[in-house]
């Protein structure tokens, strides 16, 4: 009788240790920021010139700025990057001249 009691009182322990979770292992999707058109390239109206967070580059002549600071061409022409006020950069679109 004593042996039977001992068998029913047997407690089994886990054979494998519990595995913790890691706080790493995730990343955000790429945002594809930066210049889409370089200096001297031709552009059409509405074409994106520069995608940015904040004003790294400022809009110049014939360039609009979206609510997410994306710079786009208002008219067809040639893209021109220029420095102003020391270290700031602006981008303009110089309209194409028609030779008719």
From Swiss-Prot:
Q: Which Pfam families match?
A: Ribosomal_L27
Mention one GO biological process in which this protein takes part, according to its record: translation
The protein's matches in Gene3D superfamilies, at most eight in alphabetical order, are given as: 2.40.50.100
Disulfide bonds listed in the record: none
- Can you summarize the PTM annotation of this record? The N-terminus is cleaved by ribosomal processing cysteine protease Prp.
What would be an example GO MF term here? structural constituent of ribosome
**Transmembrane segments in this chain: where?**
none
Indicate yes or no for the key word Hydrolase.
Answer: no
Keywords, A to Z, come to: Ribonucleoprotein, Ribosomal protein
Gene Ontology cellular component annotations, sorted alphabetically: cytosolic large ribosomal subunit
* Presence of the UniProt keyword Ribosomal protein in the record: yes
* Region entry Disordered, spans: 17-39
Q: Which residues form the propeptide?
A: 1-13
Note the PANTHER family from the entry: LARGE RIBOSOMAL SUBUNIT PROTEIN BL27M, RIBOSOMAL PROTEIN L27
Family of this protein: Belongs to the bacterial ribosomal protein bL27 family.
- What is the protein's given name? Large ribosomal subunit protein bL27
| Protein source organism | Ureaplasma parvum serovar 3 (strain ATCC 700970)
Q: What is the lineage of its organism?
A: Bacteria, Bacillati, Mycoplasmatota, Mycoplasmoidales, Mycoplasmoidaceae
